[in-house]
Swiss-Prot record:
Chain sites annotated for binding Ca(2+) 1: V304, A305, I307, E309, N796, D800
Alphabetical keyword list: ATP-binding, Calcium, Calcium transport, Disulfide bond, Endoplasmic reticulum, Ion transport, Magnesium, Membrane, Metal-binding, Nucleotide-binding, Phosphoprotein, Sarcoplasmic reticulum, Translocase, Transmembrane, Transmembrane helix, Transport
Name of the protein in its database record: Sarcoplasmic/endoplasmic reticulum calcium ATPase 1
Gene3D superfamilies xrefs: Calcium-transporting ATPase, cytoplasmic domain N, Calcium-transporting ATPase, cytoplasmic transduction domain A, Calcium-transporting ATPase, transmembrane domain, HAD superfamily/HAD-like
Active-site residues, Swiss-Prot/TrEMBL: D351 (4-aspartylphosphate intermediate)
Quaternary structure, from the entry: Interacts with sarcolipin (SLN). Interacts with phospholamban (PLN). Interacts with myoregulin (MRLN). Interacts with DWORF. Interacts with VMP1.
Hydrolase is among the record's keywords: no
Entry text on domains: Ca(2+) and ATP binding cause major rearrangements of the cytoplasmic and transmembrane domains. According to the E1-E2 model, Ca(2+) binding to the cytosolic domain of the pump in the high-affinity E1 conformation is followed by the ATP-dependent phosphorylation of the active site Asp, giving rise to E1P. A conformational change of the phosphoenzyme gives rise to the low-affinity E2P state that exposes the Ca(2+) ions to the lumenal side and promotes Ca(2+) release. Dephosphorylation of the active site Asp mediates the subsequent return to the E1 conformation. PLN and SLN both have a single transmembrane helix; both occupy a similar binding site on ATP2A1 that is situated between the ATP2A1 transmembrane helices.
Reactions performed catalytically: Ca(2+)(in) + ATP + H2O = Ca(2+)(out) + ADP + phosphate + H(+)
GO cellular component: endoplasmic reticulum; endoplasmic reticulum membrane; endoplasmic reticulum-Golgi intermediate compartment; H zone; I band; membrane; perinuclear region of cytoplasm; sarcoplasmic reticulum
Cysteines engaged in disulfide bonds, as pairs: C876-C888
Amino acid sequence: MEAAHSKSTEECLAYFGVSETTGLTPDQVKRHLEKYGHNELPAEEGKSLWELVIEQFEDLLVRILLLAACISFVLAWFEEGEETITAFVEPFVILLILIANAIVGVWQERNAENAIEALKEYEPEMGKVYRADRKSVQRIKARDIVPGDIVEVAVGDKVPADIRILSIKSTTLRVDQSILTGESVSVIKHTEPVPDPRAVNQDKKNMLFSGTNIAAGKALGIVATTGVSTEIGKIRDQMAATEQDKTPLQQKLDEFGEQLSKVISLICVAVWLINIGHFNDPVHGGSWIRGAIYYFKIAVALAVAAIPEGLPAVITTCLALGTRRMAKKNAIVRSLPSVETLGCTSVICSDKTGTLTTNQMSVCKMFIIDKVDGDFCSLNEFSITGSTYAPEGEVLKNDKPIRSGQFDGLVELATICALCNDSSLDFNETKGVYEKVGEATETALTTLVEKMNVFNTEVRNLSKVERANACNSVIRQLMKKEFTLEFSRDRKSMSVYCSPAKSSRAAVGNKMFVKGAPEGVIDRCNYVRVGTTRVPMTGPVKEKILSVIKEWGTGRDTLRCLALATRDTPPKREEMVLDDSSRFMEYETDLTFVGVVGMLDPPRKEVMGSIQLCRDAGIRVIMITGDNKGTAIAICRRIGIFGENEEVADRAYTGREFDDLPLAEQREACRRACCFARVEPSHKSKIVEYLQSYDEITAMTGDGVNDAPALKKAEIGIAMGSGTAVAKTASEMVLADDNFSTIVAAVEEGRAIYNNMKQFIRYLISSNVGEVVCIFLTAALGLPEALIPVQLLWVNLVTDGLPATALGFNPPDLDIMDRPPRSPKEPLISGWLFFRYMAIGGYVGAATVGAAAWWFMYAEDGPGVTYHQLTHFMQCTEDHPHFEGLDCEIFEAPEPMTMALSVLVTIEMCNALNSLSENQSLMRMPPWVNIWLLGSICLSMSLHFLILYVDPLPMIFKLKALDLTQWLMVLKISLPVIGLDEILKFIARNYLEDPEDERRK
């Protein structure tokens, strides 16, 4: 049934053809079940394990590696002689890498449990219905409830469907619907129609929503919608329709992978084609097929060389280390790739309650009557410090601390606050904080009484647990609470009937203490309290009181005001009818006005600084709240989202105002606005969508079930530590302390991580360029193999992997939060950087080939061949005139490979030092700024020595130990790379504009 909230109870009953007293007939139940289906949310069909595994192999680079492994395996199968074992090492290692990557990928996907499944926990098991086949109420499975059923709910029940209330069987009906609407206090319900068909859920005061809890009272209602048609069902559908997009880095790496795979394919084909003329060379035994296979193996080696196999592992390690650092700052990251996305966040959409504010209501102002002289009335106004539930703070008058006990009016005000109250404070010893027990508003009054300490109770030596309610206990010992007249909507107040405690010697009789909405309470006041006397309430006095309340309720403060009053001579207990709430109003008359307290959910202390940080970093903060617009704007001014006197006409909207705009203007509004008030969850998703259409990277906070679709849709969903399981599972990050400032710290960490990732991705790529150049040169010049695939894998995975990981520990730039967010479209490697890495890669490749050639031509223990012999070694036979007296097997010696590999590893270590900073010289940023890098370089070199000097590793890697002369030659060839990169950095610093600066302009 659509818009049930706007229909009268009679219309709802008529729509389903049902009577409130008897309920549906079995025949109607059957028809409705066929028409509407079962009252349950359909289970989400997850991907099978096999589908997840297959997904991991959809990446182009992974497929190229898999192909290389299969080809290597086939070639190894036909290998002869002692090379058989080493030939199998390469495909085996490649497969191991691919399996490890797939396991990590599947584990990550499985770990992000399905938020949709978490919604199931809000489905109640059972429900209580009236049906025509039985006289009394019957308990049935909640899934069997159908639209039109008459359902009974009572305190403690979970609402089984969306229900239109027909009648309330108690004084009041309070519902905790925070999971759905985010309202922090329980909501009082009624039965009258809500005329607005487009009312937001918060305003549907005659509806009970599936999954919410009855906090107090008992009621009868008719089921309007079930299953996926309920509000919680709509949320499920929104989440199911939201596809997870790839993070900017994942997109960049995918693009890079595609480009790399095209380049690899071209180079492999080119190498094979260049050497067609050599297929018949004597070294292949004159067999064309053997020659073709040999060059095919070189093409496979090229593919292995060009792909940075260690990159996925290094990225995962760097992100994992980043998540550990963030966890120390109270940001728990659930999805690794989102660590980097945080770095490009350009908009943060934050909930108000509990994130920008403390979600701990506190009284910050109060007043009592100072004196009344005819029509003249003056007030005593006080302000109170402290913005949490901790009983710490001072009462100030004209900014000077005072003792509350000196003012009789304050003593009575404190008495009303303590007694007209069902809440208390509790010190949580595990968390070390004071927490509320009961309603937020009442806890604020409890805290106020503790701060006022009107009877000068000695509290200094009390433990924190005893301190929590010390001053309230003193007041409660003086007066005994007999009974409570519960809050009701018609009078907007509640009261307690108290009698003096036996031990109390004060000459006071029974009293009624009242608190409630100012207009309602003040209308029933005939007197005002001045000191200990009471004076008649006159028109001007009333005007004065109401004008101050109005002033407090608007403007910068927008305080929530409560009026406090006493009935000095209440009726006798036995004369009062307590089961008829309609008569409570007449008992709460002839009141004496005592004072007013103004409270608010105060902004967190550190939020203002964090918002300034966001402004400096080019990040827009949008506050989204269910509060009314006035309160929302006031909080925005208070925390610095809006300036004190800034015009906010087109920068703040209510959900309704936003909906009334044409679509194009809605999109434009999202580009400008910084405040959305009175919004529904669907608005959050819409706002994210519009922001994404402007290429903004959005972080969205939320804690309720209602926030889950928007959390899932935003690039960074941020759930509160105190939020629901659904919100947490739909988000990328959880704030352990629910604090906005933690988001800003996480953004800073994300930026630092991206900068470091850029460095090590570029470092690994320049290494691969060098390897490709090396293999391409040997093939193009017709030289013997300088590096074989198993050696390349060792370099890519182990020796390069360690320094690359250590580059993740580079300290962040000092101005990291003074730059605008980077564009997600910014390339990983720009034109100049591409040239730089080609230049460095070219040097690496040439140096590696040069080292191998040096051994053949000039080394003391080498064969001393000529350049012609070296480049035509394929034609070497015993009877070939050009190779007279030369053992042809020398061209397969391990020494030149060892020289080439040692030069490659040493140059890569120098390159790691070059990567400490993109453009800063090593003179400005010496190696010891990152001690981890120095450690990893030492470890990489140790591992290189291991494969050179510890048997049987030299045999597996086809290497031989080097002597001192050879090592000196390795250093001579390797060290110039530092000088080359310093020259390129100098050019970048002095003659080319820094791309960061260019973007800032």
